[in-house]
């Protein structure tokens, strides 16, 4: 990633969003302008590490857009023995029970059973999956004004009272 004047930087997959993705193409297109925050630098090896996920908002900010009993669309991001992770927003995913004939990348119709901030959990019911279907690319919502913020010291993704802490210290 070129951050200006030919200065290269590294944006790793885990710094793109809190919701896990398998490849940067799941989130970005070649040549796209991507707002980032400088995470760290390695002057000895002339490397700059950047991050994007902090600009996409906290768990609480993202979860505020959803309500229990609501049916929404999402993208199946991973399938595990214990459930299917469905991305509701770039920084928010929930877990649904395993269902046959569902594949990673499918667009899914999702019923929100419950939202549990203290555990950063969203329980989902997968209503239906649509293999090969495509959602229009969502307009990314940034919770930090990238035109005004010039310095971040700490970013806390976890809601108050949550025992699991996800944070970035710059």
What kind of region is each of these model predictions?
Residues 1-170:
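Single-stranded RNA-binding regions, centering on S1/OB-family and related RNA-binding modules
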């Amino acid at each position: 990633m070129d951050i200006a004047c030919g200065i290269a930087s590294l944006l790793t997959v885990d710094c793109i969003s809190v919701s896990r993705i398998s490849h940067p193409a799941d989130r970005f297109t070649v040549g796209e302008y991507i707002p980032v925050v400088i995470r760290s630098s390695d002057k000895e090896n002339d490397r700059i590490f950047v991050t994007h996920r902090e600009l996409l908002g906290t768990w609480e900010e993202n979860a505020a857009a959803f309500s229990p009993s609501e049916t929404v669309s999402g993208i199946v991001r991973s399938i595990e023995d214990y459930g299917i992770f469905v991305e509701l927003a770039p920084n928010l995913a929930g877990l649904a029970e395993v269902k046959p004939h569902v594949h990673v990348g499918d667009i899914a119709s999702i019923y929100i059973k419950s939202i549990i901030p203290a555990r950063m959990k969203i329980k989902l019911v997968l209503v239906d999956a649509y293999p090969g279907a495509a959602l229009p690319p969502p307009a990314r919502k940034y919770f930090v004004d990238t035109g005004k913020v010039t310095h971040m010291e700490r970013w806390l993704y976890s809601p108050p009272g949550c025992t699991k802490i996800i944070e970035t210290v710059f």
